[in-house]
């Protein structure tokens, strides 16, 4: 017993990133050396994906409803320009990911994907019709059937109603439920190393190394989009606000915020770091004390990239050709879906099924794509969080410095 406890304590002291990396490496070895054992280990992957499928609909519903219910009206701290920058940045990231997904179409190997047939929509009209019908689905059925469009719609409506008519106690109960569900998600994510081990070992046993090559290309597209946003798009947005060389500010935010966020992999955990940096930059305290925590929820360029690229990869893998109008709609959906993803472990990955539903892709296939996201998540999630969190303080600084420039003129 003492040995078992000490072993668990020793494992607990190892970071989740290293545990996932170890599970990934062990899965490759087992799947290559003993395919039969690799296939048997696939049970761990199936259990992990099953747990994600069970919690994802509840997570989206509770989290979005709580976020809307807790929103404060009548804030006079110059927040609106920053929110505009957050939305512009997130939509620009989603649009960049759409273009990259079309220029570099990626096919990924999904276990059992050949057994699932997805009927591709004929075009934007059919997609919009399906979207509208899903909006008015029964909320209980929407959660039970993982209809993420319906879940999002009902969560927005319920959150708005609670904000306007609910008591403080009721809103706090919803917030506590959101925190509880987020905690359950974190517990499930703690089993990610074991789940990744099972997924990788069974994938290698079934398909060989072709799947990992597909994942490498997928990761290259994801990281390429994030680097492009961080070093090209975001500086252009900052220049638009401050009208001077944006790169000193950009590199300061990447160095003093992005590096921390890369290793913590949590925008929420990086809020104190961003607060300290905002104070160091001499920004307006009444502004950044609100915009930094808000940005940890709604400023989600990295999440929008992840959702868009993986959803398009799922579409191409299922043989669905994506027209530009549908891709543009995907950008909008990814922008809305990304809001609220950062404070939750694996949040952006768990919102991929919502985007996949635009293409008529089943929830089973979508959750296999989520599993692929966890396989590459050792790097993807770190880079995504670094982009998200560093942009929180970057856009806050840009808006504040832009306001100072306008006042001086």
UniProtKB/Swiss-Prot annotation:
**Can you tell me where the transmembrane regions are?**
24-44, 48-68, 82-102, 142-162, 194-214, 218-238, 292-312, 319-339, 365-385
Q: Which GO terms describe its biological process?
A: serine transport; threonine transport
Example of a GO cellular component annotation carried by this entry: plasma membrane
| GO MF assignments | neutral L-amino acid:sodium symporter activity
> Gene3D superfamilies from the xrefs?
Sodium:dicarboxylate symporter
One Pfam family, short name: SDF
Look up the coiled coil feature and give its residue ranges.
Answer: none
Q: Which UniProt keywords apply?
A: Amino-acid transport, Cell inner membrane, Cell membrane, Membrane, Symport, Transmembrane, Transmembrane helix, Transport
Catalysed reaction equations from the record? L-serine(in) + Na(+)(in) = L-serine(out) + Na(+)(out); L-threonine(in) + Na(+)(in) = L-threonine(out) + Na(+)(out)
Q: In which compartments does the protein localize?
A: Cell inner membrane
The protein's topology relative to the membrane is: Multi-pass membrane protein
Establish whether keyword Ribonucleoprotein is in the entry: no
- State what this protein does: Involved in the import of serine and threonine into the cell, with the concomitant import of sodium (symport system).
Family statement drawn from the similarity comment of this UniProt entry? Belongs to the dicarboxylate/amino acid:cation symporter (DAACS) (TC 2.A.23) family.
What's the protein name?
A: Serine/threonine transporter SstT
Gene symbol here is sstT
């Amino acid at each position: 017993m003492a040995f078992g406890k000490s072993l668990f304590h020793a494992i607990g002291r190892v970071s989740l990133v290293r545990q996932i990396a170890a599970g990934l490496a062990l899965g490759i070895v087992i799947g290559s050396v003993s395919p039969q054992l690799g296939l048997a280990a696939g049970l761990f992957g199936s259990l992990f994906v099953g747990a994600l499928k069970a919690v994802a609909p509840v997570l989206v519903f509770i989290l979005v409803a709580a976020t809307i219910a807790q929103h404060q009206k009548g804030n006079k701290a110059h927040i609106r320009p920053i929110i505009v920058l957050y939305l512009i940045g997130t939509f620009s990231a989603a649009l960049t990911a759409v273009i990259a997904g079309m220029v570099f179409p990626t096919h990924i190997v999904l276990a059992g994907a050949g057994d699932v047939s997805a009927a591709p929509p004929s075009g934007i009209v059919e997609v919009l019709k399906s979207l509208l019908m899903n909006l008015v689905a029964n909320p209980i059925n929407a959660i039970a059937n993982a209809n993420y469009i319906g879940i999002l719609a009902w969560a927005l409506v319920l959150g708005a109603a609670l904000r306007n008519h609910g008591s403080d106690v009721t809103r706090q109960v919803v917030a506590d439920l959101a925190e509880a569900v987020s905690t359950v998600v974190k517990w499930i994510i703690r089993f990610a190393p074991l789940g990744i081990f099972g997924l990788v070992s069974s994938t290698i046993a079934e398909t060989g190394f072709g799947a990992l090559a597909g994942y490498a290309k997928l990761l290259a597209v994801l990281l390429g989009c994030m680097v492009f946003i961080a070093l090209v798009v975001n500086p252009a947005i900052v220049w638009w606000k401050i009208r001077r060389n944006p790169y000193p500010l950009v590199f300061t935010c990447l160095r003093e915020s992005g590096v921390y966020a890369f290793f913590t992999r949590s925008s929420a955990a990086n809020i104190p770091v961003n607060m300290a940096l905002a104070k160091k930059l001499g920004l307006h305290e009444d502004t950044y004390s609100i915009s930094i925590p808000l940005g940890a929820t709604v400023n989600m360029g990295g999440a929008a990239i992840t959702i868009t690229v993986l959803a398009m990869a799922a579409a191409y893998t299922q043989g669905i050709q994506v027209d530009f109008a549908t891709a543009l709609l995907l950008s909008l959906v990814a922008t809305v879906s990304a809001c609220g993803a950062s404070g939750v472990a694996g949040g952006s990955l768990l919102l991929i099924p919502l985007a996949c539903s635009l293409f008529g892709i089943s929830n089973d296939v979508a959750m296999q794509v989520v599993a692929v996201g966890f396989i590459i998540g050792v790097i993807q999630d770190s880079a995504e969080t670094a982009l998200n969190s560093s942009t929180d303080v970057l856009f806050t600084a840009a808006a504040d410095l832009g306001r100072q420039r306008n006042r001086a003129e």
